Amino acid sequence: MSADESAPEGRRRLRELLEGVDNVIGDAAAVVDGLAPLVGLGGAEVGAQESFWAVRTFLAALAEKRPLIVWFDDVHWAEPTLLDLIEHVADWSREAPILLLCLSRPELLEERRSWGGGKLNATSMLLQPLSEERCQRLIRTLMGSNDLDPALVSRITESAAGNPLFVEQTLAALVDDGLLRREGDRWIATGNLGSVQVPPTISALLAARLDRLNMHERRVLERAAVVGQRFYLDAVVELSAPADRAGVAAHCQALVRKELVHADRSDLPGVEAFRFLHVLLRDCAYQATSKRQRAELHQGFAAWLQARMMGRPGEHDELVGYHLEQAYRYRVELGLRDTETAELGHRAAACLIEAADRVRQGDETGAAGLLKRAITLLPVTDPLRIRAEIDLGWALHSFGRFSDAERMLRQATDRAARIGDTGLRAHARLAHLRLMFATSPEGLVAETLGEATRALPIFIQNGDEVGAALACRSQAAAHMAAGRYALAERAMQAAVRHAEESGVLRDAQTMRRDLVHLLSLAPRPVGESVDRATRALAGVGDDRGLRRSLLAQLAVLFTMAGDLDAAMDHLARAEEIVWDVRSPRGDPLYGGFVVARIALLTDDLDTAEHELRRSCRRLARMGERAHLATRAAALADVLVKLERLDEAATYVSRSRDA
């Protein structure tokens, strides 16, 4: 796929690859919709599990035509979400002939211990250093000759210590020095190689190669190193002094001939790209520049990239934010704590927060990392920092890290109050109360209802539809906790309206799913709820999570209506989606409880006990108490019916304590 390719053309090519394998993929359009945002073709944001499903299904479809090898290079640099994706494909594609080949440094196994052994269908192979004989064979192969000075071959072999990069770069250094000349397919010595000094380490060797460059080539390489392992010709031109710009392209070609860089596919339309031959070369060139130069060049590249991206907002927020962040940190290290430095930090944080907003739907872990970096760039009373702390609190909550989330949200609430920002304080306080509902629910119904009711007009007056949706959702949570399901449903309907008005897709999706969970609880005839859910299911579109929730609720409703065949059919369809995206039976708050409710309604006490025990264990591990109280009470009721009164008493106590 090319950076110059249009989104419709890219989607068409993806669909072509999926032709003829309908038995594997089912819904090709859904697969393309899931892949498109991942490969830069735009489209609606999807969650991580939906993205994983799309990638896995796509690879399985390709493997249906012929065995498939997927190669991941330098996996030790991968973000956790990419590692999760690789693991997902390995775990859930066992019927497809797919080989996932991951090249990595050994330290990856410190993060993913099972990848080194013990994981099904996984094995590891440690590449040993080249033996002396193989090292010498590599030298002869690269030179195209056996007629080499034995002493030189021996010195290179000894210094390389089995590292093929060292061998390659040593021979390249001899070419740089004019001691080797190419004739046809062979390299010929131009003088006595017996006295050549071989640097003792790869770092010294690479530094020596860079020292041999002329001044202009060196400057080009140093500016390229600030851009990154892959760099853009136009960016290096922009970062160069006006008098040097005309020669940058020629110097890049000279660096290609010297095998320090090579042409690379660009991810920016209409821009020529190159890549350093090895990351160590890039690091060596980068370290040769001063901190002041790095700060200026990082800032300059961020400005160039933003100018290139005009009209395509948001696509490179993370990269722009990274370079502004580096410029800020180098200025701080130099003691330049002035207005310009503070402004750099603010701009960097804004970009990182925007990037977090973009990736949160599909990569909550990555979004949290971006927010943490943004927070460190801002003063403690900066509203932008407080907003980032609130978002990070929500992320920590979703990870089940309740104590960290509680501390972050309490801190954000206090800081927002200190600067007198009522809207920001309301956001922080409602988020804090939402968390406390899970961990310390005593006496929070009235307080949450009061806070939400006071906050709603503030949000509406400020035009803050996201805040208004949060306030209505908080009202619904309070009403649900009090058993007032009709009022809860009314509040959630308002939350959905505000979320849709906000234009924030993920918020609207979350609110719709929360509203669906009330279908089997609201006080109305079952048939009416079935009709509502059926109509909603017909118009659900490509939101697989919402489809799953609706199918699960229809399973409960049909069970209430006594139509067990329809109930089991809808439950099976819901679970097919759940397992398909590898979200373990939904989430611990709702997923398992759907099966338990159906089991309770049909007097299947063994299944009800199994599901409720599992749900209680999960909630207890998370430190969640509000739902645990309900599940423990339901389990106690099941145990009474099974005449296991001592165990029932234990769960009555757990429910009361929660």
Language-model features: locations:
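Short secondary-structure boundary elements
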Residues: 1, 100, 122-129, 133-369, ...
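Conserved Walker-type P-loop NTP-binding/catalytic site
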Residues: 1-69, 97, 113-125, 130-146, ...
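Helical "lid/switch" subdomain of P-loop NTPase nucleotide-binding domains
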Residues: 10, 81-85, 104, 108
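Conserved P-loop NTPase "ATPase switch" module shared by AAA+ and STAND
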Residues: 62-82
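Structural recognition of the conserved hydrophobic beta-strand(s) that form the central parallel beta-sheet
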Residues: 71, 99-104
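Inter-helical turn/loop elements of alpha-helical hairpins
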Residues: 262-263, 284-461, 466, 477-490, ...
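Amphipathic alpha-helical segments of tetratricopeptide repeats
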Residues: 303-307, 356, 373-376, 410-421, ...
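Residue register of alpha-helical TPR repeats
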Residues: 322, 350, 387, 425-429, ...
